[in-house]
């Protein structure tokens, strides 16, 4: 609604002006679109090239939305465990095959150049970054079916996403996320 866009737009402008990073929870493509449409004018009013506003979950974003994220210098934190725990149900019942196959589009994020982290959404699924990385690499459902072969990422990319990629989305990459002199272990 226009009220939601106005409210979100005011929040984004205030945050940009104060140098406060915002992480916005979006599941569906409509929620993602609302954020993109709201952040674009806010950034025109309050330019901030290193804002690193991040979409959390962002499960059903399509390729065009990832391109918009890139244009807006946004980050994404995708719920990689989702396929294992609910992939079969999403494929069969809730969003259908086409959307289920492109959910949590890690490869699209990487190929588009959108800085990416991946997460487990603990306590929704168990906290375990290596399982989260495994989920992004393999995209297996609980039944053993591969869901979205084209969105698989490599092991190195998955490890980056749970370490320095995650730190980057939090503006903490100068403090954590990699083993370097001066960083916290």
PLM feature spans:
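His/Asp/Glu-enriched, well-ordered alpha-helical/loop segment
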Residues: 13-22, 30-53, 57, 63, ...
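Active-site gating/metal-coordination segments in enzymes
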Residues: 1-7, 58
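Ligand-binding beta-strand-loop-alpha-helix segment within the catalytic cores
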Residues: 75
């Amino acid at each position: 609604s226009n009220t939601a866009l106005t409210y979100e737009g005011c929040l984004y402008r205030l945050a940009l002006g104060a140098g406060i990073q915002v992480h916005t929870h979006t599941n569906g493509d409509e929620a993602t679109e609302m954020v993109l449409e709201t952040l674009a004018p806010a950034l025109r009013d309050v330019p901030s090239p290193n804002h690193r506003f991040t979409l959390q979950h962002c499960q059903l974003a399509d390729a065009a939305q990832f391109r918009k994220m890139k244009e807006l210098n946004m980050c994404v934190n995708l719920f990689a465990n989702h396929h294992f725990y609910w992939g079969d149900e999403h494929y069969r019942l809730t969003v259908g095959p086409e959307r289920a196959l492109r959910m949590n589009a890690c490869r699209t994020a990487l190929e588009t150049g959108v800085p990416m982290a991946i997460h487990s959404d603990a306590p929704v699924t168990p906290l375990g970054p290596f399982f989260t990385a495994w989920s992004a690499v393999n995209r297996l459902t609980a039944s053993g079916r591969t869901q979205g072969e084209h969105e698989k990422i490599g092991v190195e990319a998955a490890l980056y996403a749970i370490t320095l990629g995650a730190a980057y989305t939090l503006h903490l990459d100068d403090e954590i996320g990699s083993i370097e002199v001066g960083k916290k272990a």
